[in-house]
Amino acid sequence: MKVRTSLRSLKQIPGSQVVRRRGKTYVINKKNPRMKARQG
């Protein structure tokens, strides 16, 4: 999982969804499981 300051480019990728867990914002992708990132 990468830690990025901006998730805007990652949420454009097909199959990705933005999830908020414990006050942090994550991008997860079921189609491409390598595409994971946390904002911070």
Swiss-Prot record:
Which Pfam family name is an example for this entry? Ribosomal_L36
Which of UniProt's keywords are assigned here? Ribonucleoprotein, Ribosomal protein
Please give an example of a GO cellular component term from this record.
ribonucleoprotein complex
GO terms for biological process, alphabetical: translation
Question: Molecular function (GO) terms listed?
Answer: structural constituent of ribosome
UniProt KW Cell division keyword:
no
Q: Which InterPro entries match?
A: Ribosomal_bL36, Ribosomal_bL36_sp, Ribosomal_L36_bact
Protein family according to the UniProt entry: Belongs to the bacterial ribosomal protein bL36 family.
Q: Which HAMAP family match?
A: Ribosomal_bL36
Stored NCBIfam families: PRK00831.1
The protein in question is named Large ribosomal subunit protein bL36B
